[in-house]
């Protein structure tokens, strides 16, 4: 998926994010939970695009209908947009592993509207790493958004959980996936057998 319209099976997240965006009440930190492969990191990238998409150049606020053709969206899709920083907490568990984040949070975005930190497997961070990150969650700069992804929310300290808007991503039922694939095939002029 490249935008909220393609994010099937996650209707609660899509509707809540849409409403938050329209009311100008976006959280400064999001927690995406769910089983492996459910789309947490992909969803985080979609949120990052919504926060930074410039569309035809006139967008000055985050938008729900991501264009996927502006330079910002293209860079985020390619993984080389400087203001969307992805961190694998499983391989950087200690304070030193996230010091780069802690030190860089105070600086304004390079070209985006927001600096977005996507921290995958956040439950793997050590207690000291969480403590050092906490100050940024308690008093976040206006230009920073955090998106935490995890398969094990119960391992995340309450001090982090209480500062995030939480979305539990659901496993997509086979019937929903089959219908989605049939729609794609139909648009491409192809026919598929979902029972195969």
Regions found by a protein language model. Give the residues of each.
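P-loop/Walker A NTP-binding region and its immediately flanking N-terminal helices
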Residues: 1-166, 172-186, 194
């Amino acid at each position: 998926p490249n935008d909220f319209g393609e994010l099937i099976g996650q209707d609660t997240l899509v509707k809540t994010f849409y409403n938050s965006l329209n009311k100008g009440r976006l959280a400064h930190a999001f927690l995406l939970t769910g089983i492996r492969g459910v789309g947490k990191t992909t969803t985080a990238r979609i949120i990052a695009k919504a926060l930074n998409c410039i569309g035809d150049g006139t967008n000055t606020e985050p938008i729900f209908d991501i264009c996927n053709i502006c330079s910002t969206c293209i860079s985020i899709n390619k993984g080389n947009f400087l203001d969307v920083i992805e961190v694998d907490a499983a391989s950087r568990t200690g304070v030193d592993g996230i010091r780069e984040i802690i030190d860089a949070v105070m600086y304004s975005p390079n070209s985006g509207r927001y600096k977005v930190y996507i921290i995958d497997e956040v439950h793997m961070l050590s207690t000291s790493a969480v403590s050092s990150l906490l100050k940024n969650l308690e008093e976040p700069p206006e230009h920073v958004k955090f998106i935490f992804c995890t398969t094990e929310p119960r391992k995340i300290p309450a001090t982090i959980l209480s500062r995030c808007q939480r979305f539990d991503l659901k496993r997509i039922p086979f019937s929903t996936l089959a219908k989605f694939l049939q729609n794609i095939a139909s648009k491409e002029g192809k026919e598929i057998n979902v029972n195969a």
